[in-house]
Design a protein with these regions (language model features):
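Short, low-complexity disordered leader/linker segments with a strong preference
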Residues: 1-16, 47-51, 363-371
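Extracytoplasmic "Venus flytrap"
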Residues: 11, 18-37, 61-69, 92, ...
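Extracellular/periplasmic periplasmic-binding protein-like sensory domains
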Residues: 223-295, 360
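An alpha-beta-alpha
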Residues: 23, 127-190, 209, 301
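Periplasmic-binding protein-like
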Residues: 19, 79-91, 111-113, 154-157, ...
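Hydrophobic alpha-helical segments within soluble ligand-binding/sensing domains
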Residues: 72, 130-153, 165-167, 193-196, ...
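Beta-alpha junction/loop-to-helix N-cap segments that form part of ligand/metal-binding clefts
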Residues: 14, 29-34, 47-119, 130, ...
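Segments of small-molecule ligand-sensing domains
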Residues: 280-292, 302-356
Length: 371
């Protein structure tokens, strides 16, 4: 479709979308994935028979937030100047929070794509996300424990980190709800390097499962300490484990898992279809969860137009509210806050390399798993 309005009557069928992600700096690989995924979704929709055309403002380019709050506001203002009906982004909570505050003030629909901080959607009724929130991973870890039949678990968390606290609280609460005993709760700091004391106490408590919802840089140190203390059971973390360095600890990472937004190895047809098309066009380097979430976001806006009966912001907000959507990220139901209740991927490690293990739905039922 051309960028100028077509003949009378077609104007109503154009969904104008602004997109924001990190295009430069250390996180540029996310922006690359976002741009590719958005291009792919737009091309598919515009050559399809939905009757709608998606037009990406800013000349079709994803605006760069540079993973910086100030730069994010520049990116937001840049796409807003081009009159979008909705904005997609961003991937990091730190840059999405100020954009969400402004979007709520402007009455603009913002669909966040990776920002898991609880506060993002609290900014207003026009703010949604298609990723899970931090505490949700803790809940799903507890349901994993239940599905595997473990009855005694230990949790060690970084008390100085909001993310870690959020996952820990939800994990503990859902373990208690499901009759799973917490035999030991240990604290650490996000900068700690020695976990021998906590590991020894976890082992002494008789735990069969260790939950460590902390960031990737400390994960090898913690896993090493747990195994050295004689812990032979399952160890699990959240999406912040993604990219943890297992070098020299390959055997120690056996029977370790972490939750994530999606896995490119998931056997679900929607995932394999996306992975195949993306890889053919762009290769695998930028084929990450970010790409999958931005791809789904464009299709969610199409469904919002269909549900809401129009392509203006008010119609899209109406159509997005309470939406049920099936995409690369699985089955999604947007709750009263605009947060995604959705299936979650569990990855494990084989010879130190991340491998998909299984995907559970929001009730902890198995959706798909490795053969």
């Amino acid at each position: 479709a051309s960028t100028t309005a077509a003949a009378d009557g077609e104007e109503d069928n154009i969904i104008r979308v602004g997109v924001v992600c990190s295009m430069t700096g250390g996180s540029a690989i996310y922006g690359e994935g976002a741009q590719n995924a958005v291009d792919m979704a737009v091309e598919e929709i515009n050559s399809g028979d939905s009757g709608y055309t998606v037009e990406i403002v800013n000349g079709g380019k994803v605006a760069d937030d540079a993973k910086d709050a100030k730069q994010a506001m520049n990116a937001y203002n840049k796409v807003m100047a081009d009159s979008p009906a909705a904005i997609v982004g961003s991937f990091f909570s730190s840059v999405t929070l100020p954009m969400a505050t402004q979007a709520a003030n402007d009455g603009m629909l913002l669909l966040a794509t990776g920002a898991t901080n609880v506060d993002v959607t609290q900014k207003g009724s026009t703010i949604f996300r298609n990723c899970f929130i931090d505490p949700y991973q803790g809940k799903m870890a507890a349901l994993f424990v239940k599905s595997k039949g473990f009855s005694k678990v230990a949790v060690i968390y970084a008390k100085d980190d909001d993310y870690s606290n959020g996952l820990k609280d939800a994990f503990v609460e859902n373990c208690e709800t499901n009759g799973i005993e917490i035999t030991y709760t240990g604290e650490c700091m996000s900068t700690d390097t020695d976990f021998s004391s906590q590991a020894a106490q976890a082992v002494a408590s008789g735990a069969e499962f260790l939950y460590y919802p902390c960031f990737l840089d400390t994960v090898p140190l913690f896993v090493g300490a747990a195994r050295n203390a004689g812990f032979t059971g399952t160890i699990m973390g959240g999406d912040a484990w993604d990219g943890a360095d297992t070098t020299g600890l390959e055997d120690k990472f056996d029977d370790c898992y972490f939750t994530n937004h999606y896995s490119s190895e998931d056997t679900a047809p929607a995932v394999q279809n996306f992975v195949q098309k993306y890889t053919e066009k762009y290769g695998t380097e930028s084929l990450n969860a970010c790409a999958a979430l931005y791809y789904d976001a464009i299709y969610m806006l199409l469904q919002a137009a269909e549900n809401g009966g129009g392509t203006d912001t008010a119609s899209l907000v109406k159509g997005m509210t309470g939406m049920e959507f099936t995409g690369v990220g699985g089955k999604i139901k947007l709750d009263e806050n605009g947060d995604a209740i959705k299936s979650i991927a569990f990855n494990t490690f084989v010879d130190g390399k991340v491998k998909w293990s299984e995907t559970l739905d929001s009730d902890g039922n198995l959706v798909s798993s490795v053969e």
